[in-house]
Amino acid sequence: MLINEHVRERYHFLRVSLTRVAHLVFANSHESNDLKMVENVSSTPKKGVLEDPSTLTPEVVTPRTPGHRIIKAKGAYTKDRSAKRRRGRIEIERHLLGEFDDNVGSNSLLDVPLYSLEAEPLSPSVMLEDESMEGINQSPQGISVEKLGKEDNRSRSSTPASPSLESHEFSESREAGLSQSNGFEARSHGTGFDEYFDKFSQRKTSSNTLSQLPVLDNQVYLDTVKEICTETEQHTQTLVHFQSRNFHQWYFELVNNFNLLFYGFGSKEHFLSSFVEKKLPCFPIFVVKGYFPQLQLKNVLSSFLEFLEVTPAASVSDMLIQSLSIINSPSFSLGKIVFLVHNIDGESLIDERFQSALAAIASSKNVYFIASVDHVNFALLWDTSLESSFNFVMHDATTFARYYNETTYENSLGIGRANVSNKEKAIKHVLYSLPANSRGIFKFLLIHQLERMMDTQDFDARQGEKVGIEYRSFFQKCSAEFLCSNEPNFRSQLTEFFDHNIIESKRDVSNSEILWVPYPKNLLEILLEDMMEDV
């Protein structure tokens, strides 16, 4: 309140000064006799004597008239009033308009020198002008200013002011503004994805693993599933019956040299089998169950050649060429055949070689190729060339039927472990991405290690150096098989296996480097059998 009284005095002083200057300019421009802002002052006025403005006689004067001067407000703060004007404007906006920012106000007030809150005597002309101007401004804002002034006068008379109080208030306002700005900066730096990682970076990782959970027997799981009675079985049968109305359309597309691909939620094995039996009963049918985990391209091509009543060749590439030459022959004895693939996106079929072989068979005009998919991203399996070879017409065949046969071989978590492990899938993925010479080096190492395992009793995979091969001897044997040209090339090819922990090395007592594959015997046999298809 004391600060408001000080601001009020400065505000009235500024208003009186501006009013007198405006009247003076108006008088000089129009040379009016009615203006009362010019007073005849004697050349030697008496100091300390205050004359009544009502007794003064106005006269028309010019700036050149000697002995006459313009009455100016005198006071301690007459010379520099720019900071005071800004301070008065800020306080008026704070109390009257209510649109003042605290941060801006505190910083602006800091630019103004701290004034004492003790009452200072006003200029005589200012005091008279203040009394004469009373009651002119009757707006609501003016009324609020007068009320504040009266309250401030009472507070000034009862409480002595001290300069330290004002300094303390200014310091508090400055600290409040700085704290608000610092809080805003802290909030701005904590937004976005950085805050997420900062928040969860200190969380501890649990030491629990899935291997600690009890394993459910596979047969118990199957028996429990059979006992479950689905309430939507009737609706499922209705949906299958509705889908069967499209059998004629699908058969028409097959006759016009298009292949069929069915997608949608639910098992489609029995549904597609019924379609083939009803619409294509006169044609030989070859079925591939892609959900079987141990399915290999060599086994599929060998069975397909036996289906065609032809003796299979030795290698996979020869069997594929042999199959294509038979089904594309004009004198093909069987005429048309049906090639049905359940789950063409199965784990065993997603290999690029497998998909290329199936696409080559599907491109034959003597083959009615029908397949089903269950993965939502099945389209990523094929590039433009394979997609053109398949020549699929896709249909939604949602049945909501239970995946009974498809999940029988699945290695589900918490259920009886299947023979195929994730390690086998990872190793196969790495091998398929390597050149032929690198795969030949790995196959040569597998053959040597399996031979040593046959002679070793109670072999432990953690002691693989016992069945490993010495580095220098292994390099010479690979060079004899033309798998590498020099030792740097041989070392660079082994680097890929070292990076994926497929091959490990260790130095023995004689400081010789030993190489071996740190996996169980059954896994090595599966890998070797799969690699023998390339022979």
From Swiss-Prot:
PANTHER family: ORIGIN RECOGNITION COMPLEX SUBUNIT 2 (PTHR14052:SF0). This is Origin recognition complex subunit 2. Residues 166-175 have a biased composition (Basic and acidic residues). Phosphorylated by cdc2 and cdc13 (in vitro). Phosphorylation appears first in S phase and becomes maximal in G2 and M when cdc2 kinase activity is required to prevent reinitiation of DNA replication. Component of the origin recognition complex (ORC) that binds origins of replication. It has a role in both chromosomal replication and mating type transcriptional silencing. ORC binds to multiple sites within the ars1 origin of DNA replication in an ATP-independent manner. Together with cdc18, plays a role in preventing DNA rereplication and resulting genetic instability upon cell cycle-regulated phosphorylation by cdc2. ORC is composed of six subunits. ORC interacts with cdc18, recruiting it to the ars1 origin of replication. Interacts with spb70. Interacts with spp2; preferentially associates with the unphosphorylated orc2 in G1 pre-Start prior to orc2 being phosphorylated by cdc2, the interaction is mediated by spb70 and might enable the association of the whole alpha DNA polymerase complex to orc2/spb70 complex on chromatin. Belongs to the ORC2 family. One of its GO terms (biological process) is DNA replication initiation. The keyword Oxidoreductase does not apply. The gene is orc2. GO terms for cellular component: chromatin; DNA replication preinitiation complex; nuclear origin of replication recognition complex; nuclear pre-replicative complex; nuclear replication fork. InterPro entries: ORC2, RecA-like_ORC2, WHD_ORC2. It is found in: Nucleus; Chromosome. Residues 132-184 are annotated as: Disordered. The modification Phosphothreonine is found at T44, T57, T62, T65. Residues 156-165 have a biased composition (Polar residues). GO terms for molecular function: DNA replication origin binding. Changing T44D: Does not affect function on preventing rereplication. It comes from Schizosaccharomyces pombe (strain 972 / ATCC 24843). Keywords: Chromosome, DNA replication, Nucleus, Phosphoprotein.
